[in-house]
């Protein structure tokens, strides 16, 4: 696949991992083709010849970028996978949409903003009186193509997917204006998902870097992306990302609304915010983080905290509430927001604006007061058949994590939980991907549906491409560990295949089956780079004489040769050594 460019800057377009290929599982119609990554395995060589090992198929988030038969020009965007499904239901209409304004990109009228050169199609919206959400269809008993697609991906039945969505326990983020996305589901009875945050800031980064980070993150396994841009060209950056993104995209609309009022929180208005919601809805944002639970009466509860309000969105709304001494317009206009959401099928990610920013503040009154309000808002959204997930902390020590999950399930009626970690200690700047992955694995096991990744740069700076990779892989580990603990169907297949390859010294298969094949091979080759080392029955950790797996295999071979069980072989070996010791005179030192 050829590398493309954004405004003459290089963007890395991926190829598949070594030892893997893109395959598709077909559904009930030819246009339901579910992508998977198939990992080829070599044969096992044993005493009785070779035994074939079946390939392993794994969940694939990389989109068409890793399909050698698809040519991608990121200036044009990805193919519109879902358009036929969306229009075929007969409940959407095209319309002209709003005009893009200079202030959408953070410029004054005389300035010139960057533009996306690709396909300019008219936005879609629900026809008058119609509701186009996946929750609405599920409650009507309709299994949509999106639901069937997901069922194949998750190895469950389409009816199970429909039931989970209808109950509110799962969501399918799927804006009708993001037809490029491959359907996925967020719910605790499915694979634990991970989100990767990208986005420019007023200080650093560019459109090119953010598009590259997006393609990079999905290559390593990000299930959704959040564009948290706060600098110039916000609208255009988002357009580049959405048109080229095969996974759902989320945003925090208050960030862009704040840019439109020059960063002065008290100048925000409902009209500016509403216009921003529609702007982003027309572009195709799949879920909005909205901090509607930050109420005026909750702000004083944060006064005695160690770290106060650490959520950007929460701090913006708290400042607005105090400046006007009024309740947040996100709260007072919530039903109107629901009307917008269901017009495009955008899911709520109800923001935890009062999440704890230190373990000293974990599980405090402010945090749980906001959670109560999020529970109330969830039921209002469900009244409109709008999909909802709930955002969670934050910084929480291990012994307080389960309380968060239990309260969220009870208060928010089992709506999916989406947590940032949580970070389990505050003493490891530079390693917060690890401090948070510990909490993420635990809360994923307890029932969290999606984990927001944390990179090594957390609290320190804007992550670069390498940081994104590190964060995604770390969180894939946490999510997979949670899947194993929950007993998700098929979760252990990959572990078992890798363990078998490890015991049989099939080094390349070990690399190919790992979450980061390139890193695994790199570390192996640092000490044993020769090609022959890829078939050696040892590694540099123990060497040839002390490899426990090689010794175990020797015992098995001895047992087979002598018609013994492995226990009998060990006992026979002990007897032989005892006899040898006696024959040499039974002397302790020879």
Swiss-Prot record:
Cofactor requirements of the protein: [4Fe-4S] cluster
Binding-site residues for [4Fe-4S] cluster, renumbered to this chain: 539, 542, 547
Involved pathway(s): Cofactor biosynthesis; thiamine diphosphate biosynthesis
Keywords attached to this entry: 4Fe-4S, Iron, Iron-sulfur, Lyase, Metal-binding, S-adenosyl-L-methionine, Thiamine biosynthesis, Zinc
A GO molecular-function descriptor: carbon-carbon lyase activity
Enzyme Commission number: 4.1.99.17
Catalytic activity: 5-amino-1-(5-phospho-beta-D-ribosyl)imidazole + S-adenosyl-L-methionine = 4-amino-2-methyl-5-(phosphooxymethyl)pyrimidine + CO + 5'-deoxyadenosine + formate + L-methionine + 3 H(+)
GO cellular component: cytosol
Annotated substrate binding sites: 197, 226, 255, 291, 311-313, 352-355, 391, 418
InterPro entries, per the entry: ThiC, ThiC-associated_dom, ThiC/Bza_core_dom, ThiC/BzaA/B
Similarity comment text for this entry: Belongs to the ThiC family.
Function: Catalyzes the synthesis of the hydroxymethylpyrimidine phosphate (HMP-P) moiety of thiamine from aminoimidazole ribotide (AIR) in a radical S-adenosyl-L-methionine (SAM)-dependent reaction.
Name of this chain's protein: Phosphomethylpyrimidine synthase
Natural source organism: Bacillus velezensis (strain DSM 23117 / BGSC 10A6 / LMG 26770 / FZB42) (Bacillus amyloliquefaciens subsp. plantarum)
């Amino acid at each position: 696949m050829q590398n493309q460019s954004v405004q003459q800057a290089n963007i890395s377009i991926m190829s598949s991992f070594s030892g893997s290929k893109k395959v598709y599982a077909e559904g009930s119609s030819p246009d339901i083709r579910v992508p998977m990554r198939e990992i080829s395995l070599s044969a096992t060589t044993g005493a009785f010849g070779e035994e074939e090992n079946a390939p392993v198929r794994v969940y694939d988030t990389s989109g068409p970028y890793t399909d050698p038969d698809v040519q991608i020009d990121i200036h044009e965007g990805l193919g519109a996978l879902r358009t036929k499904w969306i229009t075929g239901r007969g409940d959407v209409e095209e319309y002209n949409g709003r005009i893009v304004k200079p202030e959408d990109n953070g410029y004054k009228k005389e300035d010139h903003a960057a533009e996306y050169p690709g396909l300019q199609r008219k936005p879609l919206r629900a026809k008058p009186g119609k509701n186009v959400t996946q929750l609405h269809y599920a409650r009507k008993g309709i299994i949509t193509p999106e639901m069937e697609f997901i069922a194949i991906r998750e190895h469950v039945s389409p009816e199970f997917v429909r039931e989970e969505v209808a109950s509110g326990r799962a969501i399918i983020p799927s804006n009708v204006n993001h037809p490029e996305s491959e359907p996925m589901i967020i719910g605790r009875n499915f694979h634990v998902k991970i989100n990767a945050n990208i986005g420019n800031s007023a200080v650093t980064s560019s459109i090119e870097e953010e598009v590259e980070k997006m393609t990079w993150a999905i290559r390593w396994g990000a299930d959704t992306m959040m564009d948290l841009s706060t600098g110039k060209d916000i609208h255009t950056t988002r357009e580049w990302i959405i048109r080229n993104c095969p996974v759902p995209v989320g945003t925090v609309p208050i960030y862009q609304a704040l840019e439109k009022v020059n960063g002065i929180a008290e100048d925000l208005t409902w009209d500016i915010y509403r216009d921003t919601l529609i702007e982003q809805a027309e572009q195709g944002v799949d879920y909005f983080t909205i901090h509607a639970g930050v109420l005026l009466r909750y702000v004083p509860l944060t006064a005695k905290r160690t770290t106060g309000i650490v959520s950007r969105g929460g701090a913006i709304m708290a400042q607005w509430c105090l400046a006007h001494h009024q309740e947040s317009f996100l709260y007072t206009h919530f039903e109107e927001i629901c009307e917008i959401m269901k017009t495009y099928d955008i899911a709520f990610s109800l923001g935890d604006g009062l999440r704890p920013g230190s373990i000293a503040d974990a599980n405090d009154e402010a945090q749980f007061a906001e959670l109560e309000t999020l529970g109330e808002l969830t039921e209002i959204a469900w009244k409109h058949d709008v999909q909802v997930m709930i955002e969670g902390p934050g910084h929480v020590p291990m012994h307080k994590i389960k309380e968060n999950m239990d309260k969220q399930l009870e208060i928010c009626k089992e709506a999916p939980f989406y947590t940032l970690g949580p970070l389990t200690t505050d003493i490891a700047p530079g390693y917060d991907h690890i401090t948070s992955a510990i909490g993420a694995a635990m809360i994923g096991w307890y029932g969290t549906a999606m984990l927001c990744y944390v990179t090594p740069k957390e609290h320190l700076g804007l992550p670069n491409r390498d940081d994104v990779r590190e964060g995604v892989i770390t969180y894939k580990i946490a999510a997979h560990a949670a899947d194993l603990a929950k007993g998700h169907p098929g979760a252990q297949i990959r572990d078992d295949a890798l363990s078998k390859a490890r015991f049989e010294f099939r080094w390349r298969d070990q690399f190919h089956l790992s979450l980061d094949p390139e890193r695994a091979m790199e570390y192996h080759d640092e000490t044993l780079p020769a090609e022959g080392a890829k078939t050696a029955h040892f590694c540099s950790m123990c060497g040839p004489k002390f490899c426990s797996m090689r010794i175990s295999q020797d015992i098995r071979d001895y047992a087979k040769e002598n018609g013994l069980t492995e226990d009998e072989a060990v006992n026979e070996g002990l007897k032989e050594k005892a006899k040898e010791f006696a024959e040499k005179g039974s002397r302790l030192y020879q």
